[in-house]
């Protein structure tokens, strides 16, 4: 059965719960993560929901605000560590608009060890998406779109669950 699993709220400044991320679980038990919230609390949220980081291979980052982006650094770190230990099969693809690729890469280079950042472009793929572009993610056709926010360049997506 497909599930939409909400891991956090839509509020950036929460203190008693986690913020801004969710996951789609398909009928085969595979995951598509949307944003990662604002820090390492993403790891706790995944643990609470019994979602192994090693089973997440597709992630979409909507924009660069801290409550969406900073948890992504932790995801890259933990996925990279799992790759290094031989406990992560395949690649992790992080979809985001083209302006976020360098932002994400730079933050990782400034905060993570080289053996993790060396995986970016190899096993951790930063995949830029354009307005109107379609990708096959899990068994879903996903269409990305620019939401025209005045706060920051932000993308969303459309898909149809089975």
Regions found by a protein language model. Name each.
Residues 1-162:
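Binuclear metal-dependent hydrolase catalytic cores
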């Amino acid at each position: 059965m497909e599930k939409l699993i909400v891991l956090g709220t839509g509020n950036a400044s929460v203190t008693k719960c986690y913020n801004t991320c969710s996951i789609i679980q398909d009928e085969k038990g595979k995951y598509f993560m949307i944003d990662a919230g604002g820090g390492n609390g993403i790891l706790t949220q995944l643990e609470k929901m019994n979602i192994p980081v090693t089973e997440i291979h597709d992630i979409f980052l909507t924009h660069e605000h801290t409550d969406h982006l900073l948890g992504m650094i932790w995801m890259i770190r933990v996925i990279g560590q799992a790759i290094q230990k031989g406990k992560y099969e395949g690649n992790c693809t992080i979809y985001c608009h083209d302006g976020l690729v360098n932002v994400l890469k730079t933050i990782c280079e400034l905060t993570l060890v080289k053996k993790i950042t060396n995986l970016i472009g190899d096993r951790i793929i930063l995949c830029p998406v354009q307005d109107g572009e379609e990708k096959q993610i899990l068994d879903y056709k996903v269409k990305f779109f620019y939401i025209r926010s005045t706060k920051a360049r932000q993308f969303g997506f459309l898909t149809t669950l089975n």
